[in-house]
């Protein structure tokens, strides 16, 4: 059968966040490439829920990596600021951003020569329409 229907579905929140950040910061979705540049942000969806068929609420982790702790912290704070601005301007599917927790990991577990700061944020996004 080739019946076409229009559905409402979740957005790819990792990509939405990356797109919101790309003009201002170097941002990657999982997996982090082997040759990543710093400072950068790694975006990982770690949970979420559906609210009344209109919006999704996503739990997202932002991991900032840089050559020193001050730059990692600055990169993380800038990323959160850019996402809040995107939500306020409504230039993406992102409608609201709230920080649940943030802090320093000390050194990056993958590359101990780098410092790492992380935040777990909650992102509210509109559903998208798709024909299938």
Can you annotate each of these PLM segments?
Residues 37-45:
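A short, hydrophobic beta-strand-centered structural micro-motif
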Residues 1-25, 44-132:
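Charged, amphipathic alpha-helical segments and their flanking helix caps
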Residues 32-36:
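A short beta-turn/loop motif at secondary-structure boundaries
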Residues 27-31:
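Short, well-structured beta-strand/strand-turn elements
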